[in-house]
Amino acid sequence: MSKKPVALIILDGFGLREEEKGNAVAHAQKPNFDRYWNEFPHATLRADGENVGLPEGQMGNSEVGHLNIGAGRIVYQSLTRVNLSIREGDFFKNETFIKAMDHVKEKQSALHIYGLLSDGGIHSHIDHIYALLDMAKQQNVERVYVHGFLDGRDVGPTSAEVYLKGLQDKFDEVGLGKLATVHGRYYAMDRDKRWDRVEKSYRAMVYGEGPSYKNGLELLDDSYKNNIVDEFVIPSVITEEDGTPVATVKDDDAVIFCNFRPDRAIQLSQVFTNEDFRGFDRGEKMPKRLHFVCLTKFSETVKGFVAFKPTNLDNTLGEVLSQQNYTQLRIAETEKYPHVTFFFSGGREDEFPGEERILINSPKVATYDLKPEMSAYEVTDALVKEIEGEKHDVIILNFANPDMVGHSGMLEPTVKAIEAVDECLGRVVDALLQKGGAAIITADHGNADEVVTLDGKPMTAHTTNKVPVIVTEKGITLREDGILADLAPTVLDLLGADKPKEMTGKTLKQ
């Protein structure tokens, strides 16, 4: 029996875990979610590792989750692709990398590597930076500088020492490379148009402006003394003995930006690649004739060379709905809007025929623990109005709160975030059921299920725990061995629509 509208409701970062300590999902009062879990068919899904095209044991994330959900198949992720190419040796023959290295040899200029110094595997992996250093040595590049971004979010909040020491060990092993600047990801990897943050990173890289230190460990020591953890380290310059910067980015240099996930690499890349950039005044030292390489395709708005080009995903859920003349709505607040649009559509920027999008602005606060409800109420107000207007056959909705507040590593704000989302969930599901529709309530990965470790430390990273799935249709059962790729086929099943052969996921309905 076909249902309309069908809403796929993604509670971002809402994982399931038996241990209640540090578990905001367990601590939160969430009467609506609990009622749906008890009343309707439900199961759990794997959202990590090889189930979503990542290496075994790797935690999932929002980009990967939405790609898999929208594609209806396991999508092999950039991390897996790059790792494989290093293992098989293709990485070291990559023509895009070779051209960048040839460029600096010809111009007698420097190669700069930008990247998140972390093995979190969400935005980057430090092994990829190590591989580039090996390759630069093989290619006889003489001057290589690393501009390192500190994580503290997908890994422990004060774990940077491990990565800075590892990087120095690699420089020593290869006999090449120096650390030039160090930045908290809060600055260098902003994705919310807070150009004042990005400008601090740019000015450190190009002008050598900002706090200066003899080495990365001295910088860390100073930051920690001032209660600044890795993520928030102020963009800083590493200097030689005489106090001059180790390196700045200059005319004719080359850059390889070694993050593979686009969303937090776009803004900094635009600063260096776009002639018509208007975010801030780049000044007279803006590097000219810069040879800029992105590890993966970041965006149409970034004018750089791409080392690992995208693999095309045909017949994602959005495309199939459009082909079969179903209307669809994508709705989220700023922080997760790219996920329900670009990533959900398999890396496609444009809307499909019959697709509408609603973007609700995320609140302008320094960190979301200060406003745990974020813009959930505004998203819900807009969506309930759309449901009552009966315009859309399918709705893709993301509530950002459990993930974005969960990254704070603070229990109380994350509990509040979930309670706000639960209130909103009740309003959305009520509106759907009143119209004879159905909801699939699920998540893309875990996070809020562990925000404090068992020994009381903040846990800011995602988890590998299973995620829930509830289908608000009685009289059916759901199988227990599902993965995120099974959600799109389930949407099509509820609609009574045909599933394309490219979708290797299977409906969760038994």
From Swiss-Prot:
Keywords: Glycolysis, Isomerase, Manganese, Metal-binding, Phosphoprotein, Sporulation. GO terms for molecular function: manganese ion binding; phosphoglycerate mutase activity. GO terms for biological process: glucose catabolic process; glycolytic process; sporulation resulting in formation of a cellular spore. Mn(2+) 1 binds at residues 403, 407, 462. Its EC number is 5.4.2.12. The active site is at 62 (phosphoserine intermediate). Its cofactor is Mn(2+). Coiled coil: none annotated. One of its GO terms (cellular component) is cytosol. Substrate binds at residues 123, 153-154, 185, 191, 261-264, 336. Pathway: Carbohydrate degradation; glycolysis; pyruvate from D-glyceraldehyde 3-phosphate: step 3/5. InterPro entries: Alkaline_phosphatase_core_sf (IPR017850), BPG-indep_PGM_N (IPR011258), Metalloenzyme (IPR006124), PGAM_B_sf (IPR036646), Pgm_bpd_ind (IPR005995). It catalyses: (2R)-2-phosphoglycerate = (2R)-3-phosphoglycerate. Mn(2+) 2 binds at residues 12, 62, 444-445. It is an enzyme of class 5 (isomerase). Pfam families: iPGM_N (PF06415), Metalloenzyme (PF01676). Binds 2 manganese ions per subunit. The modification Phosphotyrosine is found at residue 36. HAMAP family: GpmI. Monomer. Essential for rapid growth and for sporulation. Catalyzes the interconversion of 2-phosphoglycerate and 3-phosphoglycerate. Belongs to the BPG-independent phosphoglycerate mutase family. This is 2,3-bisphosphoglycerate-independent phosphoglycerate mutase.
